């Protein structure tokens, strides 16, 4: 099992989504899967990012709800860095 690290920006993103009425059970499920496996199943469409987010991964919790993370294998950590809509994040 990986150690979860929540960035301050991720925590703020979650609060904003809660305020907007998003179903937090969906992100909890995704986070649990990341914690256990380090990745998400294909239905989340996980993929690597490029540019400023090189070495980061993104997946879709819903079609316009994303989660971004970075895996640190040596440290046995997964950093949850951002979550939100495409327009929130990019």
Set out the residue ranges of the language-model regions:
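Basic, Lys/Arg-enriched alpha-helical interface segments
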Residues: 1-64, 72-79, 87-90
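Short, charged interaction patches at domain edges and termini
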Residues: 69
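Residues forming the ATP-binding cleft of Hanks-type serine/threonine protein kinase domains
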Residues: 84
